């Protein structure tokens, strides 16, 4: 019986990766696999979602998962759910690892690897993904790119104290 379930998941995953219909066909196929998906969700072409345990993934209303993203919820015997909250945006080619919660209105930049949860309305980027800005307007239907960019507020890094060996010679 487990082999039949695995075959079904792999077959539906393959179909969802290749067929058109980012808000219709792909969403329906992933739901059939067991992924919990809200309304108004966009799933980009060639996206891979946890093959062995799709039931560990939740994508809430209005979220966007860009093309060629990978969402994993387990490694061997390590199983942790992944949740993508309302209006979150996962950029193309991003990788989300087990146990991550992407907060409401959060944005993951293209190509980022997310190893820790992302707070609501925060933009992260890099490998591993780090917070770089606060998001005023998440990039969803009806939001112009210019308005999204204008809404970003950089997160300033805390300045660290200079140690004695780093102070300039001759300064007082």
Question: Whereabouts are the PLM-identified features?
Answer:
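C-terminal segments of enzyme domains that contribute to small-molecule binding surfaces
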Residues: 14, 82-90, 95-96, 127-172
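Extended, small-residue-rich solenoid/repeat segments and analogous flexible loops
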Residues: 2-49
């Amino acid at each position: 019986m487990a082999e039949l379930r695995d075959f079904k998941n792999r077959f539906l995953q393959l179909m969802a990766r290749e067929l058109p219909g980012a808000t219709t066909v792909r969403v329906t196929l992933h739901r059939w696999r067991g992924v919990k998906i809200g309304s108004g969700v966009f799933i980009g072409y060639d996206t891979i979602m946890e093959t062995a345990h799709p039931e560990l993934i939740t994508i809430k209303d209005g979220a966007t998962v860009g093309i060629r993203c990978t969402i994993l919820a387990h490694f061997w015997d390590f199983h942790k759910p992944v949740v993508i909250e309302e209006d979150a945006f996962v950029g193309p080619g991003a990788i989300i690892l087990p146990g991550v919660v992407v907060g409401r209105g959060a944005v993951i930049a293209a190509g980022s690897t997310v190893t820790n949860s992302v707070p609501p309305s925060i933009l992260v980027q890099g490998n591993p993904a780090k917070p770089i800005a606060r998001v005023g307007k998440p990039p969803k239907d009806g939001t112009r790119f210019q308005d999204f960019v204008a809404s970003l507020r950089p997160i300033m890094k805390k300045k660290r104290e200079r140690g004695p060996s780093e102070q300039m010679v001759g300064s007082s």
